[in-house]
């Protein structure tokens, strides 16, 4: 195969990897945890993955503790948990 063909194949495989969603079997278990505001009162917007809705949803986070299903951005949540 020519170097141009190899580069095209590599580019297509990279694109496929980026665009393929996380499958439920590859999704971290913490993505199944419910949203947890935590005990603090430094309220800020955060995102959690909702297995029932199959999407990342914004919620109010207290700023400490909570659980691992807590992301600063919707993009971070989707790249980690969304299927």
From Swiss-Prot:
Species for this entry: Pseudonaja textilis textilis (Eastern brown snake)
Subcellular location(s) of the protein: Secreted
Tissue specificity: Expressed by the venom gland.
PROSITE patterns in alphabetical order: BPTI_KUNITZ_1, BPTI_KUNITZ_2
Residue ranges the record marks as coiled coil: none
CDD domains: Kunitz_textilinin-like
PANTHER family: KUNITZ-TYPE PROTEASE INHIBITOR-RELATED
Domain BPTI/Kunitz inhibitor, residue spans: 31-81
Organism taxonomic ancestry: Eukaryota, Metazoa, Chordata, Craniata, Vertebrata
Transmembrane intervals: none
Paired cysteines (S-S): 31-81, 40-64, 56-77
Keyword Magnesium tagged: no
Gene3D superfamilies: Pancreatic trypsin inhibitor Kunitz domain
Protein name: Kunitz-type serine protease inhibitor textilinin-6
Annotated Pfam families: Kunitz_BPTI
The entry's keywords: Disulfide bond, Protease inhibitor, Secreted, Serine protease inhibitor, Signal
Presence of the UniProt keyword DNA repair in the record: no
InterPro entries: Kunitz_BPTI, Kunitz_BPTI_sf, Prtase_inh_Kunz-CS, TFPI/VKTCI-like
Entry GO terms, CC: extracellular region
Record's signal peptide: 1-24
Purpose of the protein: Serine protease inhibitor. Does not inhibit plasmin, and does not reduce blood loss in the mouse tail vein blood loss model.
Protein family membership: Belongs to the venom Kunitz-type family.
Domain of life from the UniProt record: Eukaryota
GO MF terms, alphabetically ordered: serine-type endopeptidase inhibitor activity
């Amino acid at each position: 195969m020519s170097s141009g063909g190899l580069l095209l194949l590599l580019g297509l495989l990279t694109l496929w990897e980026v665009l393929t969603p996380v499958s439920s079997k590859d999704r971290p278990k913490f993505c199944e945890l419910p949203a947890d505001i935590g005990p603090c009162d430094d309220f800020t917007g955060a995102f959690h993955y909702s297995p029932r809705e199959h999407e990342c949803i914004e919620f109010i986070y207290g700023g400490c503790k909570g659980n691992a299903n807590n992301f600063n951005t919707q993009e971070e949540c989707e790249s980690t948990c969304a299927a």
